[in-house]
């Protein structure tokens, strides 16, 4: 995918999320500590942004930078859990998995 198309897609995601939150460009600019002109350019896909501005925008919109860049939704709770699992031994991970499977069974889900 070329850069211009990526920027346009990212801009579309920013605009959709902003509107979904009921924010104006001005309100998003204030919330993200960026200028209204910057938000406008970002939404139009006319400009890329530095990583620190991408992070500000994502935080203000309550989404991950991955979502803005690619459209992939990463639930922050799942990401946090994943980081915690990385600190466990393989045996401990299997134990956590069995506990999760039991919870799924108890609450009507399928045993994965």
Task: Identify the meaning behind each predicted range.
Residues 33-48, 70:
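Recognition helix of helix-turn-helix/homeodomain-like DNA-binding domains
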């Amino acid at each position: 995918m070329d850069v211009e198309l990526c920027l346009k897609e990212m801009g579309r995601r920013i605009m959709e999320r902003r509107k979904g939150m009921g924010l104006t460009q001005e309100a998003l600019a204030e919330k993200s500590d960026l200028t209204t002109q910057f938000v406008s350019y970002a939404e139009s896909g006319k400009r890329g942004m530095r990583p620190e501005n991408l992070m500000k925008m994502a935080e203000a919109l309550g989404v991950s930078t991955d979502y803005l860049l690619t459209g992939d939704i990463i639930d922050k709770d799942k990401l946090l859990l994943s980081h915690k699992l990385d600190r466990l031994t393989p045996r401990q991970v299997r134990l956590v998995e069995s506990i999760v499977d039991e919870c799924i069974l108890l609450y009507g889900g399928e045993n994965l």
